[in-house]
Amino acid sequence: MKITHVLRGVEWQLSTPKHLMIYQAFGWTPPKYAHLPLIMNNDGTKLSKRQGDIHVEHFMKMGYYSDALLNYITLPGGGFTKGDNEVLKLDELVKIFDISTVKRSSGRLDPAHLDRLNQLFIQRKIADGEMNELTEQIRKIVMSKYSGNISLDDLSTEYLEQIMCWCQNRISRLDELAGSDFEFLWLKPDKIDISNIDISNPLEVLQSCIECVRNMDTFDESSVGSEMKKNAKRMKVKFAPYMKFLRMCLSGLKEGPSVGEIMTVLGKSKTLERLKHASCICEEKESRTRTES
């Protein structure tokens, strides 16, 4: 068979003398044996095929990419001189493999590290300009979660790419974008709770803010922050409650990303839509209050 080298798990080490004697009995030249350390669970127990969460299908359904999984299972055993903050493709791993750096002790799989590797993979795809696959996956995830409340027109490639660049340090799997923390990216808030926000004239503030945003030529985080500060001063409203109020109007969140971040990732057009939507809600509230009184 002309086999010169055998690499196998360390559990075969005790059987090696028997195998060598068999070769000797037949007068054959034995191959060179190397015994590799086992890959264990994070708690030190052995991996088992009876574990439901150890199958590749499980990880794929969870939204992990094959390159992230590949790096995840190669790191614990060694053999690769690469940093922890990079994800390499299979052909790249083949080129740098060095058996002399294989570890002697068993390695452990840390699920948190898989999340980090998956995040790094997403970041690499973005850095390499390979975003078509990512945006198409996000489109399917969001349409599946919010079908009936959102249309494909709301999920343009340009908008999804903008979101990916913004959230690449915030997520490790694309399906997280369908979670409650990121719902504001897809849906307008259906109610605005300003009961604990010190804003006495919400409708006037919103109308002023709409005009301010409409007149902005440059729409980046720095410019937005600067203009909102000026507008708060013009309206004689304290800056902190003013920004809390705008965050609530734009996202429905009491806490979360800054107003500058939210406006920038939504873009000027969607920001104006949200502010006008919030203005309608506030106007209806004021109308009901006048009627009741």
Give the positions of each predicted feature.
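Basic, amphipathic alpha-helix used for nucleic-acid engagement in HTH/winged-helix/SANT-Myb modules
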Residues: 193-195
